[in-house]
Amino acid sequence: MPELRGGVWRARLRSKKVYDVQDADPAASPVSPAPRGRTGRRGGAAAGRGNKTVAEGGGRKALKPRGKGCRAVDLCKDQPCKDLPEVIARKAVTGKAQEDLGLNKVADRAANLMMDGESGDKFAAAEDESTTTPVPERVQVGNSPEYITDRKLGKGGFGQVYVGRRVSGGGSRTGPDAQEVALKFEHRSSKGCNYGPPYEWQVYHTLNGCYGIPSVHYKGRLGDYYILVMDMLGPSLWDVWNSVGQAMSAHMVACIAVEAISILEKLHSKGFVHGDVKPENFLLGHPGSVDEKKLFLIDLGLASRWKEASSGQHVDYDQRPDVFRGTIRYASVHAHLGRTGSRRDDLESLAYTLIFLIRGRLPWQGYQGDNKSFLVCKKKMATSPELLCCFCPAPFKHFLEMVTNMKFDEEPNYPKLISLFDGLIEGPASRPIRIDGALKVGQKRGRMVVNLDDDEQPKKKVRLGSPATQWISVYNARRPMKQRYHYNVADSRLHQHIEKGNEDGLYISCVSSSANFWALIMDAGTGFCSQVYELSQVFLHKDWIMEQWEKNYYITAIAGATNGSSLVVMSKGTPYTQQSYKVSESFPYKWINKKWKEGFHVTSMATAGNRWGVVMSRNAGYSHQVVELDFLYPSEGIHRRWETGYRITSTAATPDQAAFILSIPKRKPMDETQETLRTSSFPSNHVKEKWSKNLYIASICYGRTVC
């Protein structure tokens, strides 16, 4: 029964793991021969020939889209995606399905520029540099002095920076009266200027006077450009790293660490996260000035709020896997996966920055191609802190462990993070970087002793460097009913089990595969009145599926095996009125988002090796859906979705990733209880226990759960 909490009814939601993990080693699994095409009762099809075109069947007038779906911001290229056919069916009224060779192909066009190179690797909401409008030779904005535009200092995702020399007057090195300033130009056609001045202006205005953030003295528009007049600064940490032989001492990097943490603490206290922490965005003060050893954090073009300005509450969690903001080399894993930015992400990027400055290289450098972000994220998840920091002093490993284990809305313990590096920092005379901010944080600690081991409960590590795969089973509360499972089913025995279940009034509700053997869940609560299935040597046999669509069957369960074969189950008695599916070499989030906008919802998913198959249907009974995609079981994301009313309705996993579709049903069930379980073997020992609590398997898959 639901529990009453805080004045509202909340369902019982549990995620349980059985700690009998086995290593992921698909190559060691027994491989059965690729099956010949087989058709279950009431079906009928030849062996599959593979999907070579996109096809659409004629049918009834499409329903109006239901649900608002998720709005995707097309900021960067997809994860690796070799698009395979999309197939759409409409329930036939007359005639055969007509092929449309044009055919709803999804154009996955990247909207960013990629700044490729060992120091950049940046995907961002970048401006279109196709404009050839020269920057003004002379600049005067607002009540500023007049400046002559001199040499170019650099170019980023949101603009370009030049030296500005004052035409007359000015005698100081910094401040509004400086002889030299930095002029940042952003073209009015830049994506950041669609609605007027750049968003960065608003951030600088809010952060005015914030420790470690350079001052903006004047701003305004001149011709086609929005212009910021800022303090001139010195070399970046990237420049310094290059000048000292591409390796910094642990002492120097420790000084950088504590001061950078202090700067981020001040920035975060204003409600913002930076979003692009890296060596190129940390600059020292102007050479010869009093600030030449002071650290500054620049480029707020990707800054975002972690705290709502009006309410002061933490922003809501979300994940949009097609959105990436930052620089690939230093971005947090959560940024790669499209999760809403929060304070933990800046700190994870700082950890990679510090390790890079000491080691001179990160293990994920060198990847190229459209799937670069995917490969880098996969490598980050697979690299344990022990391995990544094997040539670094222990404090850097401890720092990385702490920040990569933080929750989405967790407040960082900045004093504790700074205190990690106390033993590496020498006296004031030998410090290459001023650590004024860190010292102030230390003064706040006062006489308190920060115990690094005992002041809080130890957290479970999320990145072990030992990938593993498991069964993931999802259980929903139902009225008592008959349910049956079969696992380790060979191709030759599949028909026998299904026939026996049909004779007992059971229909297939979900299917899965592991090591080229099948798992079947059959129950009496599907509501189906007829069912057909096909075991094919290809992954989702288009011709057979379209043939069944013509007979008013709809896909209700799919599974794929490592050897590329698939099991497709189609049923009558569903509420669906239209259906579409896609096979892709990567998780097809952009296609899913497109279909959401057309009123479809995900109703089945499967994988075959590293290929994904996703089925979407109209009139599925959901008002909204979201995706949780990760290189491990996304426990935090699932629990956050549960708390906001979502329930898991589809699951699938490859040896690399696990994906979960969570939905809000239009009709709220009497009992919303949902539980998940992860086991190294099929959960036969646990299912009966669940049945005794009226919890029944709703979805099951086998794949990556641990990194």
From Swiss-Prot:
The keyword Zinc does not apply. Residues 147-425 form the Protein kinase domain. One of its GO terms (molecular function) is protein serine kinase activity. Its main location: cytoplasm. SMART domains: S_TKc. Expressed in roots, leaves and stems. Expressed in leaf vascular bundles, and proximal regions of the shoot and roots. The keyword Transit peptide does not apply. Its EC number is 2.7.11.1. The active site is at D276. This is Casein kinase 1-like protein HD16. It comes from Oryza sativa subsp. japonica.
